[in-house]
Design a protein with these regions (language model features):
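HotDog/MaoC-like acyl-thioester-processing domains
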Residues: 1-34, 122-186
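Hot-dog-fold acyl-thioester-processing enzymes
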Residues: 2-117, 178, 182-186
């Protein structure tokens, strides 16, 4: 399944240009509900270096109009950090980029997954130049109303080890690779 060309106009940052946009590609390597083990923890595949470009583009994509979020010059003079403020769910960009295409946490990309709940806690704003490492922990796995739920906790630390944010992400997932294949090939 090719990514529609109309999405290309939204691809502006260097990270976006290299981000795999078609989640149907490589789904065979994604972790499934059956594969996931509660308590399993590990680092994401990639780190994420925070840039003004990343924050500005995400804020604009969210429809923000506050000059503290979309006008770098205004933010330099008026923001408490002297930098653009981030949209509260900017952390999801870090997660999707960092998780990569194989290993723990990749179930977040699974074709057919549904997102019934998420909770994000911002401990302190990300700053330009910070190198963010994401640690993924499978925190819960259960069946409710006949549907397989999986929850992971993502902790985002900067290069100094300071915890910057936490994201509890829950998805209803296809249980097995065969279930994912039925959805992906439909």
């Amino acid at each position: 399944m090719a990514v529609p060309g109309r999405l290309d106009k939204f691809v502006k940052t260097e990270k976006q240009r290299h981000f795999p946009k078609d989640f149907m590609t490589g789904w065979q390597d994604y972790e499934t509900w059956t594969d996931a083990t509660v308590g399993q923890s590990g680092p994401a595949q990639r780190t994420f270096v925070i840039t003004e470009e990343d924050i500005l583009d995400y804020n604009r994509a969210c429809g923000e109009t506050d000059p503290l979020m979309v006008d770098p010059e205004y933010a330099r003079k008026n923001s408490p950090t002297g930098e653009l403020l981030q949209h509260p769910i900017f952390v999801t960009t870090i997660a999707f980029y960092s998780l990569g295409e194989k290993g723990i946490g990749t179930w977040i990309r699974t074709p057919g997954a549904r997102n019934p709940q998420q909770r994000i806690e911002i401990i302190e704003p990300f700053r330009y130049g910070e190198v963010v490492t994401t640690t993924v922990t499978t925190s819960q796995k259960f069946v409710q109303r006949g549907k397989p739920y999986l929850q992971m906790l993502l902790d985002f630390h900067n290069e100094k080890g300071v915890l910057k944010a936490r994201w509890w992400c829950s998805l209803i997932l296809p249980e097995t690779q065969a279930d994912v294949a039925r959805f992906a090939n439909a």
